[in-house]
Swiss-Prot record:
The keyword Glycoprotein applies. It is found in: Secreted, Extracellular space, Apoplast. It comes from Oryza sativa subsp. japonica. Glycans are attached at N198, N249, N260, N343, N373, N483, N567, N596, N748. PANTHER family: BETA-GALACTOSIDASE RELATED. This is Putative beta-galactosidase 10.
Length: 809
């Protein structure tokens, strides 16, 4: 079964800064550029944008995600285009459901936002094959992302298809639509030098640009991470954690930051990466300081300001919203003004923008362990380490990247509340029918060699059976040895499961050694190879094999002598019987057993089914799959994705400290701000409300591949549990329990000075009864509240003028 198109929502919305026009409206819009900005209808503008990948959420979620993005100060939404989702089989297209790309762009337009169409069609995106269809490999002479007719023909056909769909729907700016930029290829410059064919790579990237421009879309084309050999008819852009020191390859084009990574992707064996709101704001403020801000920057990736469920991730969302607001307030001077840099000391710089009689200033402290005082026009400003202050009038600090005023929200998982429903789920079960695969008969075809899995299965299933037989005289014991390029392998001898193994930590070449008893006569060996997604990045990634390609496969006796089966007659069959029967759709004709309430546990290749009532309310619904091992989950026939809660995240030093100061990095030494070490890599899976039926049973089906215990599975809701905020005397504190009419139920802490612990478990310092009274009166029973911090609410004898408040929702 394939899970690459699983509908579990992953919203990647975050910060992005660009120079554009006002909200997209009726009538054609011209989009050009110069060395300072994009120019829309002759006017320079700054626009804030972010990324939402339409296949990673449901169409019903799109309006709310886009609305929250806009409320966070964004003016544009960008997305990749997912080729293998739209064309899973050659010339068989999919533009429905969460692949209805035109509907997605219309939702953006309806919200009054701009859009950026990143066709690629190679996208990376932590997506199978980087979005390229596996069937491309079946075409003779095919070489991915090099100058060759087979690849370029297919790429042009798909690119033209997408462009024409957008033209037919009047989605480009010149047609009155929201799309103001389009992208061709993606991060090709990162791998060009590793392809061992510089001429072909150069010819290919120039062909891409020429092909794109022939589409006549009426908006500029961009290329990400193309720092050398840049075609003259595209704008090259920057991706990364920091882009303030990056510049385009030539004059006359604007400096564009297409991906500002707000975190990092999650792997099965890795903890969660968190990039602090302070560091993201620091990077963006430096980017504006360096060249004035008429540019595009896209925040992309995980730990984003909207989480995978579409909830606000605070304080990141609020802190960046505050930054967006300040940048907008000095928009005109940034895009038209002249600027001067002044170095005050090592790693401390002041940049002053001037336009007519107005000015705006940035003060930058790049020291990662030292606060500094900077005197500007007679006023001294304290600047924390690793921060930027923005002074819209060069006098008053309106924003400092290290000082967060936005609230922190702690989301909690709550047991679902459904009246009259038993607490535990009642499961029935069915064993996967392995019998047809336990002999080497009835395969799709035979070969006297061990084939590569992706080519053989065309990526239509995670599973491929390799089956052979051997005639043996008498009984004997052997060790079955299999060398495989993974990602996972199960071995059966004469119908009995004798061993299982998977690749450790992404090192896909591994061995399986299992005891094997042969009887007199014909013996059958069945090997089930499983993939867990396909490589999406790097040079020639399509040539990375999967499965038992080449082997060897041997039977080794007690004396070390081997019988090499690698060139035996192997029968091949992709998929499992349950896939062909579509058990996950719960069709009539499937016989489920409840065994009088006793459910088998820790049995590999078992299907489980239960029903549940949708949790009341509108909060996010998740299913907790703790207790299971490895498999796939569906709700009402909708794929939630692969699960593997038995795979725990490694212990890493970064799990034990988090300091926003200093360079953030996701790879190599120096990782920090990690959580979840030693815990399941993922145990909670989003169940979009649109998947659920209210007032009637909902069906969940699990395919447990490795053997687990479903008795611990439960459905829960996710909502704000605690909210916290800090502010100095003279400022205000705003608290909110978020959406769905959640109200503030208690004020837990009102403390001046440093509160100990973390939000949700703060221990107060110097408690203020006056502050407690003020927040109780203003906030209890309210969805949100704002309180001015005055001297009247300071605690008696409290030395600090910073108040920390914690409330329960």
């Amino acid at each position: 079964m394939k899970t690459k198109t699983a509908a579990a929502a992953t919203c990647l919305v975050a910060l992005l800064v660009v120079v554009l026009a006002e909200a997209a409206g009726v009538g054609g819009t011209t989009v050009t550029y110069n060395d300072r900005s994009l120019v829309i209808d002759g006017e320079r503008r700054i626009i804030i944008s972010g990324s939402i990948h339409y296949p990673r959420s449901t169409p019903e979620m799109w309006p709310d995600l886009i609305k929250k993005a806009k409320e966070g100060g964004l003016d544009a939404i960008e997305t990749y285009v997912f080729w293998n989702g739209h064309e899973p089989h050659r010339r068989q297209y999919n533009f429905v459901g969460n692949y209805d790309i035109v509907r997605f762009f219309k939702e953006i337009q309806n919200a009054g936002l701009y859009a950026i169409l990143r066709i690629g069609p190679y996208i990376c995106g932590e997506w199978n094959y980087g979005g390229l269809p596996a069937w491309l490999r079946d075409i003779p002479g095919m070489q991915f992302r090099l100058h060759n007719a087979p690849f370029e023909n297919e790429m042009e056909i798909f690119t033209t298809l997408i462009v024409n769909k957008m033209k037919d729907a009047n989605m480009f700016a010149g047609q009155g639509g929201p799309i103001i930029l389009a992208q061709i290829e993606n991060e090709y410059g990162n791998i060009m030098g590793q392809l061992n064919n510089n001429q072909s790579a150069s010819e290919y990237i120039h062909w891409c640009a020429d092909m794109a421009n022939k589409q006549n879309v009426g908006v500029p084309w961009i290329m990400c991470q193309q720092d050398s050999d840049v075609p003259h008819n595209v704008v090259n852009t920057c991706n990364g954690f920091y882009c303030h020191d990056w510049f385009p390859n030539r004059t006359g084009i604007p400096k564009i930051w297409t991906e500002n990574w707000t975190g990092w992707f999650k792997a099965w064996d890795k903890p969660d990466f968190h990039r602090s709101a302070e560091d993201i704001a620091f990077a963006v403020a430096m980017f504006f300081q360096k060249r004035g801000g008429p540019y595009i920057t896209t925040s992309y990736d995980y730990d984003a300001p909207l989480d995978e469920y579409g909830n606000l991730r605070q304080p990141k969302y609020g802190h960046l919203k505050d930054l967006h607001s300040v940048i907008k307030s000095i928009e005109k001077i940034l895009v038209h003004g002249e600027y001067v840099d002044t170095n005050y000391s090592d790693k401390v710089t002041v940049t002053k923008y001037t336009l007519d009689s107005t000015s705006a200033c940035f003060i930058n402290n790049r020291n990662d362990n030292m606060d500094v005082n900077v005197t500007l026009d007679g006023t001294t400003h304290l600047l924390p380490a690793w921060s930027v202050s923005i002074l819209p009038d060069c006098k008053t600090v309106a924003f400092n990247s290290a000082k967060i005023k936005a609230q922190t929200t702690v989301m909690v998982n709550k047991a679902k509340m459904v009246e009259k429903e038993p607490e535990s789920l009642k499961w029935s079960w069915m064993r996967e029918n392995l019998t047809p695969f336990m002999t080497d008969e009835k395969g799709s075809y035979r070969k006297n060699e061990l084939l590569e899995q992706i080519v053989t299965s065309t990526d239509q299933s995670d599973y491929l059976w390799y089956r052979t037989s051997i005639n043996h005289k008498g009984e004997a014991s052997y060790t079955l040895f299999v060398n495989t390029t993974g990602h996972e392998l199960y071995a059966f001898v004469n119908g009995m499961l004798v061993g299982q193994n998977h690749s450790p930590n992404g090192h896909f070449v591994f061995q399986l050694e299992s005891p094997a008893k042969l009887h007199d006569g014909k013996n059958y060996i069945s090997l089930l190879s499983a993939t867990i997604g396909l490589k999406n990045y790097g040079p020639l990634f399509e040539k990375m094999p999967a499965g038992i390609v080449g082997g060897p496969v041997k039977l080794i006796d007690n004396n070390g002598k081997g019988i090499d089966l690698s060139n035996s007659s192997w029968s091949y069959k992709a998929g499992l019987a349950g896939e062909y029967r579509q058990i996950h759709l719960d069709k009539p004709g499937c016989t489920w057993d409840n065994n009088n309430g006793t459910v088998p546990i820790n049995k590999p290749f078992t299907w489980y089914k239960t029903t549940f009532q949708a949790p009341a309310g509108e909060d996010t619904v998740v299913v907790d799959l703790l207790g299971l091992n490895k498999g796939v989950a569906w709700v009402n026939g909708n794929n939630l994705g692969r699960y593997w809660p038995s795979y725990t995240a490694a212990e890493m030093g970064g799990c034990h400290h988090c300091d926003y100061r200093g360079v953030f990095q996701a790879e190599g030494d120096g990782q920090k701000c990690l959580t979840g070490c030693g815990e399941p890599s993922q145990r909670f899976y989003h169940v979009p409300r649109s998947f659920l039926k209210n007032g009637e049973p909902n069906t969940v089906i699990l395919f447990e591949e490795a053997g687990g215990d479903p008795s611990h599975v439960s459905f829960r809701t996710v909502a704000a549990g605690s909210v916290c905020a800090s502010a100095e005397v003279g400022d205000t504190i705003t608290l909110s329990c978020g959406q769905h009419s959640k109200t503030i139920s208690a004020i837990n802490v009102t403390s001046f000075g440093v509160a100990r612990g973390q939000c949700g478990a703060y221990k107060g310092g110097c408690e203020s009864k006056a502050a407690y009274k003020a927040f109780t009166e203003a906030c209890l029973g309210k969805e949100s509240c704002t309180v001015q911090i005055t001297n009247a609410v300071t605690g008696s004898g409290c030395l600090s003028n910073v108040l920390t408040v914690q409330a329960s929702c």
